[in-house]
Regions:
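C-terminal motif of bacterial Sec signal peptides marking the signal peptidase cleavage site
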Residues: 24-28
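Short, solvent-exposed loop/turn segments enriched in Ser/Thr/Gly
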Residues: 67-73, 122-130
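Bacterial signal peptide processing site
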Residues: 30-33
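Short, hydrophobic/aromatic beta-strand segments
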Residues: 69, 82-89, 143-145
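Extracytoplasmic/periplasmic copper-protein system
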Residues: 36-49, 140-142, 147-159
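Intrinsically disordered, low-complexity Pro/Gly/Ser/Thr-rich segments with frequent PxxP/GP/PP motifs
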Residues: 91-120
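Asparagine-centered strand-capping/turn motif at beta-strand->loop junctions
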Residues: 74-80
């Protein structure tokens, strides 16, 4: 059995102390740096809104010009044990649509055959349009929604 010499023991102590000091310094950086996952934000083009138990994410209104029809694109989650009817209303008389969100599911309004089309959009692409989402369980939830042109990955979303 070999016994460490004094210089070897000193090197081990110094290495351990350097490791502990470095770990403490690196861990301390996290204290003053906020974690991005602590902040809620919309990472896509659209906005998020909750209508009672329904969770709408990445909501946008696809339309090429003011006065033209528009398609509402969004992912809608229903975590409840019952189907929920969701109404979407835009500006103007009779400018609304309704879709049923099945229980325990998430659907994409623009992809899953549940296309929601409004007859008239009162805002130009690049601006915000006021839409009201409503359900019997939650009442009305007005929200400003970005209007995007039917180009790029929205090219297939024409009324």
């Amino acid at each position: 059995m070999t016994v460490p010499t004094a210089s070897r023991r000193l090197r081990i102590v110094k290495t351990t102390a350097a490791f502990v000091a470095g770990s403490t310094l690196l861990a301390g950086c996290q204290v003053i740096s906020p974690r991005q996952t602590d902040e809620m934000y919309d990472a896509g083009d659209g906005v998020s809104v909750n209508v009672g138990p329904l969770q709408l994410r990445n909501v946008v209104l696809v339309s090429d010009k003011v006065g033209a029809a528009g398609v509402v694109s969004a992912a809608v989650g229903n975590p409840t044990a019952e189907d929920i009817a969701l109404s979407v209303t835009g500006a103007g008389e009779g400018n609304s649509a309704q879709v049923t969100i099945p229980k325990h599911s998430t659907i994409n309004l623009s992809v899953d055959g549940s296309k929601v089309t409004l007859a008239k959009v009162d805002a130009e692409p690049g601006s915000m349009a006021q839409l009201t989402f409503s359900s019997a369980q939650a009442g009305n939830s007005p929200v400003g929604v970005p209007v995007v042109p039917a180009t790029g990955y929205y090219a297939d979303l024409t009324p």
